[in-house]
Amino acid sequence: MNDIWNPWHGCKKYSEGCENCYMYYLDSQRDKDGSDIYKVKTNFNLPLKKSRNGEYKIPSGSVLRVCMTSDFFLTEADEWRKEVWEMIKLRPDITFWLQTKRAERVLDNLPSWWGDGLENVIMVFTTENQKRADERLQILLDLPFKHKGIMCAPMISEITLDQYLSTGKFEIVLVDGENYEGNRPLYFDWVKKIYDECVKYNIKFDFCGTGNVFIKDGKTYNIPKAYQRVMALKSELQNPLIYKEKDIKIQPRCKTCKRRFSCNGCKWCRKCNWK
């Protein structure tokens, strides 16, 4: 099962990739301000919640993507994060996917018991251009995490990751374009370059989505949100390439699910034929 855990909500725009933040846009549709940061009390202890039968609501083997509407190392969340670390420690049977742009804050905000890291945590640094990649990934190389990844999203200019991938310290790279109210283009050639680098070093690569504006072979495509993932999958820029569209029978709603590449069932249908 793949799910999202947002122990807090809201964020402060931090770098170029934040200009057209999807969370700010979605909040604005509800007449809310995305810069308002607050603890999500009803969901704060999600990993520890149990059903009436005493079993965890998040079953063993699940992947929890943490703070998808914020940043895990946000300054305003320092006190809440201490509790989150303890919950992560108490659930070694599920994987916690952490993301941040705030590379310089990570080391000083690890718990005292951290040591060389936990087996059930993957630390993913988000980068949007070469400048931010060089700033952040050099830091991540030296941080005490057993599992590390890179997410180029929204990718707003060409990036090369060869010098970082060659270290053997990264397990996965993801690329996505800009969506919702953002229209900065994503070029096929940019995606292909990173894909080739991942293939070179046998690193998992996931082209998550094209974004609203996708350019290939000199042609500009304006792609609706519902089809951005589908078009990315059809490019076959996935490593490993574990499927071809025509070979898989899937639930209709799965065609637009951004987590389809790593899906092992979801809380909505639990009938995924992906496997």
Region annotations inferred by a language model:
Residues 89-92, 144, 192, 199-200:
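Anion (oxyanion) recognition and catalysis
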Residues 18, 66, 98, 140, ...:
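Conserved, mostly hydrophobic/aromatic
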Residues 3-9, 162-275:
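Auxiliary Fe-S-binding modules of radical SAM enzymes
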Residues 98, 123-125, 150, 207:
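Structural beta-sheet core signal
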Residues 84-88, 137, 191-195:
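Generic structural signal for well-ordered alpha-helices
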Residues 125-133, 138-172, 177:
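Histidine/lysine/aspartate-rich catalytic loop segments that bind and position anionic ligands
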Residues 2-121, 130-134, 159-170, 266-274:
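Conserved Radical SAM active-site core
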Residues 102-103, 154-155, 212:
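Conserved beta-strand edge residues that scaffold enzyme active sites
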